[in-house]
Amino acid sequence: MSKASLSPNVEDLKKKQIRQYKEIIRISKAQSIRIKELQLENERLLSENIDLRTTAINLEEQLETVQNENEENKTKLAALLNRFHEETDNFLSKLSLCQQEIQDTFKPVEANLAYDVDTDSEDLDEESVVKDTEEIIEQAQHDVSLRNLSGIEDENIIDDGETAINEQKKREANVFSDTQSAPQLKSGKALPADFENPYNLSNSKPVNNNNEDRVEAVTSENKSIDSAPQEKNHEYEIVSPKSLSNKINNQAAAQRRTEEDNANGVAQEENEGSQEAHFHSRIQSDTVIQSTPTKRKWDVDIQNKQINLASAATNVTGYVSETDSRPNRANSLDSAVLLVQSSNKSNRNGHHISDPNLNSSISLKFAPEDTAHNSLTSQENVGPQVTTTSLSNMTVAESPRTDTPREINGLVDSSVTNGNEKFSVEIMNDSNKIGLNPKSFTDEEREILTLFRNPPMRLSSEPPSSNGFSIAHPNNSPLRPPSLQGILNAEDRPYEIEPSRSSFATNDTGSYNNLELLSSVTNLKSPNENDRVTKTQSRRETKVKRRRKARIQETSEESTVVNEPNEKPDGRSRRERKKVNYALPGLRTKLRRNFDLPSDHVKAKKTRRAPKNSENDSATKTETANITSEAPTTSEVTLENSETLNL
């Protein structure tokens, strides 16, 4: 009974618990649903909050912008008000001024006249004195400036008073009122009769006749100018000091130009006849120019030098002839010919030179080094005395007649003949570095150059040339510096550069023995030995090492002595030899086997020594092999075990 009574109670309890669990599950589901709803509501509220915040922020920004606009409008209004007040004040002030002007204009005239008449007589006297003194000072300053600028000192200005001042103004106006003097001088027309020439301008025009006709024309024109009547009752303008100085400078420049034009025209027209007679033996062109790849310092301004040379020759001989005026005539000066026609009949001043001792043989020398620009100095002497004309970097020397050409240090070859009256300068062709002529050297210079050609023998301690090629000369002379080849080999043919040979080929005579000395110190092999010896030696070494592995220690030592004939017993250990060899520079390379050293510096691999009781070891090996062959395999053991389990 007890068991039957207990069983329903347990079942009831189980049912109650199941009900409670179901209720709890239902409540939890409802709560979870409620929680989800609350979460959704919370999210919605958060989103609304965010929207409200953004709108609030936008409203605040708008409010700030509106406030700023209001402030700007206030400032603008204040500025407009201030401007309006200022304009109103100005308008009122103008109105007041207009009222005052109207009142002033309608005042009676008698009051003004009375005010003007009421002046003190003493004040009038003082003002007149001051004005008079100022006028006197201004007039004096004007007179002094005119006298200083014109350069004319006239005593009548001080003595005669107003008449002298009028005459001075008249002269200045005659000189500077019209600029007709320069064109009249150039064209050769006669000057006006009232023109005065205080600066002694040359009024002569170029004349085609002799010097006497030219002088007569000049004197006749001067007489006509001086004899012309002068008008005195003209009115002249007062010229300022600045314009006066400018006119004076222009007049002086015009005077210089006219004088130069007249002189050049007279010289050209006087020498026209002699020019046609002496130009039949002329060379094709005045200057023959050959371009070179290199330019020296004195080749840069050669055109100016040629022009200056021509002007210098005119001072010595009288005339320069030039026909070729092309722009590219003076690009370089490696070889050039300058022809200067000289005339002994008349010089620039019209004087005749009839001395037979004076010839036109002229030598020219160009100095390549940079010298100071010397002024043009010309000296003309009659007789065998040499006259020189130096211009910048050039020297023109006049010497007596010589039939043979002159050579100045191999630079210039000049030849002039008196019959043709020709001045020619030939600059030698620059075929080598500097264009020196070997025939022009003196004995001392040739001795020095022979030393350069055949230098003393090289000592045995000097290293050979490290170039990849050797230079062979027909005379078997030693190597020369390349900068002197153009000077030393002007007569001989140039060097023949052979294809590259080894630097040892030049040392066949044994004069240089440093390589043998180095090989004796470092036990180097001679370079003439073949590489096959080194290969065979290395093969022998490898064979010896293989044999050492299979031999006993005693027999291996004997084999190393027998199979290495290059090894020399010098009583040193291998470590000592290694230290000596590695101490020398340049031995830690891949070509170490090329050295004539014993092979002991190569570290040999360690050989495994064979055991002394080799027979016992072989017996043990055979026993172990038999044991392994008799032992069953693992597969057989597993099969036996499975059979026993089944049983």
UniProtKB/Swiss-Prot annotation:
User: What family name appears in the similarity comment?
Assistant: Belongs to the shugoshin family.
Compositional bias of type Polar residues: which residue ranges? 242-253, 282-293, 375-396, 462-478, 621-647
Positions of disulphide bridges: none
Sorted alphabetically, which keywords does the UniProt record give? Cell cycle, Cell division, Centromere, Chromosome, Chromosome partition, Coiled coil, Meiosis, Mitosis, Phosphoprotein
Query: What residue ranges carry the coiled-coil annotation?
Result: 28-87, 125-145
The protein in question is named: Shugoshin-2
Which residues lie in Basic and acidic residues bias regions? Answer: 528-541, 593-602
Molecular function (Gene Ontology), one example: chromatin-protein adaptor activity
Compartments annotated for it: namely: Chromosome, Centromere
Indicate where the modification Phosphothreonine is found in the sequence: T292
Q: Where is the composition biased (Low complexity)?
A: 200-210
Per the record, which residues fall in region Disordered? 171-295, 375-416, 453-486, 522-579, 593-647
Q: Does the keyword Chaperone apply?
A: no
Function as written in the Swiss-Prot or TrEMBL entry: Involved in chromosome cohesion during mitosis and meiosis by preventing premature dissociation of cohesin complex from centromeres after prophase, when most of cohesin complex dissociates from chromosomes arms. Required for faithful mitotic chromosome segregation and proper kinetochore orientation during meiosis I. In contrast to sgo1, it is dispensable for centromeric protection of rec8 during meiosis I as well as protection of rad21 during mitosis. Required to sense the lack of tension at centromeres during mitosis.
